[in-house]
Amino acid sequence: MITYTKPLSKLIGHFEKFPGIGPRTAQRLALFILKQPESTIRDFSKALLEAHNNVGRCKKCFNLTSEDECEICRNTERNQKLICVVSETKDLLALERAREFKGVYHVIGGLISPMDSVGPELLEIRSLVERVSKSEIDEIILALTPSVEGDTTSLYIGKLLSPFTKVTRIAYGLPMGSELEYVDEVTLARALEGRTKLN
């Protein structure tokens, strides 16, 4: 077993808490940080604190923003009557990379998962229903991960929203359990084009 000096071990431990970062990558990142000049480390620390203190949730769609409303919600060129429902901001970013979707989003903040004690009340589903019921919405597109949790959440939302508007779900050319953020832009664009009606 490798023994690190205490400050280095602590730094590696922090990096290991990041999603998708294993011990080797954490070690590589920590060693890279130690090679940087103090000014770079100060700038990095400042950027971390600034992002942590100033980035919150859009009051309308719950995307990340430093304003009351995110850039997408404020953009008058986007179709405000077309809402794409995603689990996390990372999924929104994946769809934006595909450059196919011209509407707005609603980030629910996870998926219904009874095994993990995540019920609909812990997600931004009630706010979505309120948003749809108070506006003239042409279509809701559900772009949730193709998994048991994603299917459960889609069916639950579809049932709640179908009295108000058309609800569709994007088509998938990927295996069950795949994360949207790892899907290439062409596949995502085709998935949006080939969406099917849920209600």
Swiss-Prot record:
Molecular function (Gene Ontology), one example: DNA binding
Keywords, in A-Z order: DNA damage, DNA recombination, DNA repair, Metal-binding, Zinc, Zinc-finger
Pfam family, one: RecR_C
GO biological process per UniProt: DNA recombination; DNA repair
Residues in C4-type zinc fingers: 58-73
InterPro entries referenced in this protein's UniProt entry, alphabetically: DNA_Rcmb_RecR, Rcmb_RecR, Rcmb_RecR_Znf, TOPRIM_dom, TOPRIM_RecR
Family annotation (Gene3D superfamilies): 3.30.60.80, 3.40.1360.10, 6.10.250.240, RecR Domain 1
Superkingdom of origin: Bacteria
All residue ranges annotated as the Toprim domain in the record: 81-175
Record has DNA damage as a keyword: yes
SMART domains the UniProt entry points to: TOPRIM
Described function: May play a role in DNA repair. It seems to be involved in an RecBC-independent recombinational process of DNA repair. It may act with RecF and RecO.
PANTHER family, per the entry: RECOMBINATION PROTEIN RECR
Family statement drawn from the similarity comment of this UniProt entry: Belongs to the RecR family.
Protein name: Recombination protein RecR
Species: Prochlorococcus marinus (strain AS9601)
